[in-house]
A protein has these predicted regions:
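Membrane-interface interhelical linkers
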Residues: 1-8, 41-68, 113-122, 139-151, ...
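Specific transmembrane alpha-helical segments of multi-pass solute transporters/efflux pumps
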Residues: 12-20, 45-96, 129-133, 222-240
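Hydrophobic/aromatic residues within transmembrane alpha-helices
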Residues: 23, 32, 36, 83, ...
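Transmembrane alpha-helices of multi-pass small-molecule transport proteins
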Residues: 26-75, 100-107, 162-166, 185-204, ...
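C-terminal-most transmembrane helix of multi-pass membrane proteins
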Residues: 31, 36-38, 213-214, 250-316
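Helix-helix packing/entry segments at the starts of transmembrane helices
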Residues: 35, 73, 91-98, 169-193, ...
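Hydrophobic transmembrane alpha-helices of multi-pass small-molecule transport proteins
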Residues: 44, 66, 105-106, 119-139, ...
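C-terminal transmembrane-helix exit sites in multi-pass transporters
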Residues: 51, 55, 100-125, 254-274
Length: 316
């Protein structure tokens, strides 16, 4: 059963960029971001009610989760949707893999007790090299399509940097308050949905053209990829531990690239998978995953985050 959940999480998170790309065929970027967040929040609220979990009452928990909702949900989901107007979904899924690198950088800046060791610095440098390979600066001036995608690629780095800030906030303040991860994630997504609905009349404007493809894509992106996948991953982390569960990070770009190339017919430049592999190698080095496996037979990486969204796990 846990192996099935692992595959489901990899497929749902890996396909998030694919479904967002389809959603953009009939919705504006901020509309895609708002709909996915609202559907994800509603799905988790149903899970919370069915399982009879209680809502937090402490103001401190709600206050910190409001900050988390901004940096782990509202901002990254908006940047992701905006970026995919010009960036292929497969390449966007590869950029999502830079999240652990950004998290280490944010921890070093925002959490006084966190100090980068040589291994982590080496992993970060390797990750930066991977990003440069992904961008392909040798093609920027010679290919108008690549040049047009540069702002979107920068936005995707902003997305993962936002993850890093949010996760560093969690590490510094420990906002879980003793509540289980599903409850915390439900509050987090509900707050994010509320924020995005408030600003929707101003930023989520534009014509809406719906068909079965777009509706299905948004349900898959919101209810499944942003809602149910949270519950699945929570159970997986509980059964396997965060280190082993985090290896899904290595599969989601594979799913994203495969869907983009095979289904959407997106071009794949040689430097994109190469850069992605360099980034993943940097993550493995910085997180100590390879060394931990040699010593203990299990990973020591942080729990993964879905594409364009992230969740708070208790006092993480």
């Amino acid at each position: 059963m846990n192996a099935l959940l692992y595959v489901l999480v990899a497929l749902t998170w890996g396909s998030s960029f694919f479904f967002a790309k389809i959603g953009l065929d009939g919705l504006a970027p901020q509309q895609v971001a708002t709909v996915r967040t609202v559907l994800g929040a509603l799905t988790l609220v149903v899970v919370l009610l069915v399982t009879r979990r209680r809502w937090p009452r402490e103001k401190r928990v709600w206050g910190h989760l409001l900050v988390v909702a901004v940096f782990l949900n509202a901002v990254p989901s908006s940047l992701m949707a905006w970026a995919e107007q010009t960036v292929p979904s497969g390449l966007a899924s590869i950029y999502n893999a830079t999240t652990p690198i950004m998290t280490l950088l944010a921890l070093a800046v925002l959490v006084p007790t966190e100090r980068l060791n040589r291994r982590q610095v080496g992993g970060i440098v390797l990750g930066i090299v991977g990003v440069l390979v992904l961008v392909g600066p040798w093609d920027v001036l010679g290919d108008p399509q690549v040049l047009a995608s540069v702002p979107g690629q920068v936005a995707l780095l902003g997305m993962t940097a936002s993850y890093g800030i949010g996760l560093a906030w969690l590490r510094r303040f420990g906002v879980g308050g003793g509540y289980d991860p599903t409850t915390v994630a439900t509050v987090q997504l509900t707050l994010a949905a509320g924020l995005m609905l408030v600003v929707a009349p101003v930023v989520a404007t534009g014509p809406v053209q719906l068909d079965w493809r777009i509706v299905g894509a948004m349900v898959a992106l919101g209810a499944v990829g942003t809602g149910l996948a949270y519950a699945w991953n929570t159970r997986l982390v509980g059964a396997w531990g965060a280190g082993r569960a985090s290896t899904v990070t290595y599969l989601t770009p594979v799913v994203g690239v495969a869907l983009g190339v095979l289904v959407l017919g997106e071009p794949l430049r040689w430097n994109e998978p190469v850069g992605g592999l360099v980034v993943l190698a940097g993550i493995a080095l910085a997180s100590g995953l390879l060394g931990a496996r040699r010593r203990r037979g299990s990973g020591a990486a942080a729990a993964p985050v879905p594409a364009g969204e992230a969740r708070a796990e208790g006092g993480r």
